[in-house]
């Protein structure tokens, strides 16, 4: 089985409690990102094997395993697991590293 990292999306950021996104829940924002990756790549949601989300500050609405909650909000099947990685400012990079080390491909062939 080949592992394929087919796409990624990043949520916008803004000053706390200000701007057009101030009232949007973080799990909703991440769910929209997941939907966009599925749309861009024309994926069948049932073909998604995993969702790994980097979250610098998992508190409030984003403190309840935002990777799992967002995947469900995005309409992925409940059989698709979701995971949240917290390494503060390095959360997104750690999520990519986690993906690479949990994929079935040999580590020495990663380019």
Language model features: what each stretch is:
Residues 63, 82-91:
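Active-site nucleophile and cofactor-binding loops and adjacent substrate-binding regions
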Residues 89-99:
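Conserved beta-loop-alpha segment that forms the PLP phosphate-binding cup at the N-terminus of a helix
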